[in-house]
Structure formats: C-alpha cells, structure tokens
C-alpha cells in the first residue's frame, strides 16, 4: 500500500535517527519504553499501516492506540490536515482504525490525534463502544477524562452545521449518563466566541426539558464537582447565559431556569445532610424552610425561637437559605429567606457557607442584572441589603420591590414581580 505524501511528511517531521530498514516492533508486546517517542511512533506507524489490509490481525487497534499517545509532539494543525487525507485512503478499513483511535482517546485524552478524531462520526461510534466495555465502565475517572477530551474535540467541528448539531446531541446523549459536568465545565470556561458555548447550551436546554434528567445531572454536578461548582455556574453565566441575544433566549427557557432550581435544591440537600451530622435539630428546620413553593407556606412556618437563635448564633455569622422553588419561564422568581435575631442584629444578614452556595448566589445576581438591564451589581448579596432597614419594610436592592418580614417568625422574604 502507498502512503499519501502528506502522511509521510507528518511522520518524518520529527527526527527519527537510528531507525534501520529492518527495525520491527512486536505488536503483541508493550512499546519499547526506552525509545524516544518519535522513534516509537515512526516504527509503530510503519508496521501498522500495511496491516490494515489484513483484518485478521487483531493487534492493529492496540498498535494504533500506542501510536496515539505519541502524537502530542505533532502540531495539531498537521494532525487535522493529514489525518483527514489519510482517512480518505483507508475507507475499507476504517472500523479497525477508529477502534484503535477510540482506545487511545480513552487513555490519552490530551493526544492531539485523540482530540481531533472526535470530528469524525465513525470515530465517535467507536469511542462510545469502547466506553461500554467493562474495563471502562468500572473506571469512572477514565470515563471523565474521555468526556473532557470530547469537549475539547468540539472545538474542531463546525457547531453551526447539521453535523455540528449531531456532535452536540450525541455528546449529550452519551455523556449525560455519567460525568457530563466535567466536559461542560471545560467548555463553560472557554471563550464564548468559540461557538461551542451557544450550541452546547442550546442542546442542554432541550435535554433539561426532562425533569428526571435535570435532577440527575444537578445531583451529579453538585456531588462530583462540589468544590468547583463556582467555576461551572460562573462560567456558564458569564460566557453565554447572560450575554447578548442568544443569552436572552436561553435565559428565557424554563428548562435552563429549572436547571438552576435543581442545582440549588441539590446544594441545599447536601448542606442539610452536612449540618445534620452536627446538630440534631437542624434537619427539621431546614426541611421546613427549603421546600417553600409560595409565600403562604412561608407565612405558615412556625419554629421555636430559641432553636433559631441557637442555630444561627452558635456560629460567627447568621445563616441564609436560598430557595429556588419558584421558577418562572421569563426568569427566576427567587425567594431569599434570612432568619435573624433582631435583638442581636438590627440588619438581616446573609451567611455564605462555602464557595458552592456563593456561586449560586452569584448566578442569581447575574440573572437579576440581566433581567433589569443594569450595568453594575454588588459582588456579595449581603451588600444588597440597606445598612439600616426600616422597622417594617426592607427594599429589595435588585428590583426595588418591598421585602416583607414577620418580627415574630423572624422571616424575611421577597415580593415577586406580580406582588405575590
């Protein structure tokens, strides 16, 4: 078989001094670890390519997989150009090729060859087949690496084309089963001008129309990347959800809004379980506060005042609870609940217990800023409350709507846009 001249140029671009005409590599044994990467890559490629015309050779995929790990030394642009040309010449044996590439992509996600290969539908099918094998199902970290690689591979597809849409929806369908958030996190932190953000979020909004999927993904996100949820939320918010016309359309999608709702509830549940280990009375308190769906339920809440004081004044600060239960299609009607002791503190204050909850608050701030078309907003939600609120009415800094509170129940809640 004759190799395309472009492929030969690719392979010979790196120095391969010392490679003799009679050199052979045993495809049934591991690669020579003491050889320079360029030499190993050259030897393997020279041995593998002719064997694509011998389907009975089951070592082809393994050898190509070994070659994949060495392609980081080859410029990505060259990989893109010359891999595509080579694929055209290998049509009869692509299944074997893709199998090897998929195996390599799972184990070496940073390989340039792995990253670009995701642009090819047949490769994506082979990659999914590899993931379904037992060895990959039992290695969740490896799965997450492969998903992240796919996210990077999306950079090299035209996401505005029908093929690009197929890539996005295929990615969502496969990756949402496990570790979706890792790929989304990577994409969320990229420049929104890349085109990946709008296309991915558009697909996500459709995916999240399914409430069960929403809950599952929200739980996965909050459990798997709890310390990094701030990056996920902030990245999605600043890159796409809250910018420009496309952002406005996505923002108005109930499914996108509901995702924040599900994530907020997952965080609250996680926090409740953490607090439950510390003080036995906290679960009942949180359980009473968190499922609030309307103001009437808030008004009906009655708790022992001493418990509330013990709960919040045991710590250095008071506590806040964010309820995300009132999603509206045109945004989020967010109820903020602050329980405080007036005799100890004249101003209701909000307590941030870690980066995760702060990130949800930041997402809310960005949401409100977008809705009200304001240019600047406070970095901390506590800054939004007046230093000396009136005794009976506090104004919501974001919407200039009055906040009602009950001195007896020590509750502060916001009034929605419709006055409820």
Language-model segments: residues:
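Short acidic linear motifs
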Residues: 17-420
């Amino acid at each position: 078989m004759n190799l395309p001249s472009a492929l030969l140029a690719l392979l010979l671009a790196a120095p391969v001094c010392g490679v003799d005409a009679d050199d052979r590599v045993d495809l049934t044994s591991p690669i020579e670890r003491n050889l320079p990467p360029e030499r190993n890559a050259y030897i393997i490629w020279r041995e593998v390519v002719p064997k694509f015309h011998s389907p009975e050779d089951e070592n082809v995929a393994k050898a190509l997989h070994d070659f994949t790990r060495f392609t980081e030394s080859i410029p990505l642009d060259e990989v893109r150009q010359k891999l595509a040309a080579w694929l055209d010449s290998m049509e009869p044996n692509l299944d074997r090729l893709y199998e090897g590439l998929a195996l390599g992509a799972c184990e070496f996600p940073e390989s340039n060859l792995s990253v670009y290969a995701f642009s090819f539908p047949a490769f994506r099918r082979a990659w999914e087949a590899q993931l379904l094998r037992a060895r990959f199902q039992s290695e969740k970290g490896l799965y997450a690496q492969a998903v992240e690689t796919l996210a990077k591979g999306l950079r090299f597809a035209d996401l505005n084309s029908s093929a690009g849409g197929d890539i996005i929806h295929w990615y969502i369908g496969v990756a949402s089963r496990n570790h979706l958030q890792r790929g989304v996190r990577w994409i969320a932190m990229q420049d929104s001008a890349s085109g990946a953000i709008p296309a991915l979020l558009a697909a996500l909004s459709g995916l999240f129309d399914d409430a069960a999927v929403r809950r599952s993904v929200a739980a996965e996100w909050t459990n798997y990347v709890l310390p990094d949820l701030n990056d996920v939320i902030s990245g999605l918010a600043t890159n796409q959800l809250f910018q420009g016309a496309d952002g406005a359309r996505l923002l108005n999608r109930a499914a996108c809004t509901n995702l924040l709702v599900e994530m907020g509830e997952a965080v609250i549940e996680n926090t409740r379980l953490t607090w439950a280990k510390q003080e036995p009375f906290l679960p009942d308190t949180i359980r009473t506060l968190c499922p609030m769906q309307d103001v009437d339920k808030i008004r009906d809440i009655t708790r022992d005042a001493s418990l509330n004081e013990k709960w919040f004044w045991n710590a250095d600060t008071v506590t806040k609870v964010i309820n995300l239960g009132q999603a509206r299609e045109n945004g989020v009607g967010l109820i903020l609940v602050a329980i405080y002791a007036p005799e100890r503190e004249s101003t209701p204050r909000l307590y941030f217990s870690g980066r995760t909850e702060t990130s949800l608050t930041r997402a809310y701030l960005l949401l409100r800023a977008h809705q009200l078309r304001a240019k600047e907003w406070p970095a901390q939600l506590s800054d939004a409350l007046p230093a000396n609120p009136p005794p009976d009415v506090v104004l919501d800094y974001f919407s200039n709507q009055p906040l009602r509170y009950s001195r007896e129940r020590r509750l502060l809640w916001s009034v929605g846009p419709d006055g409820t």
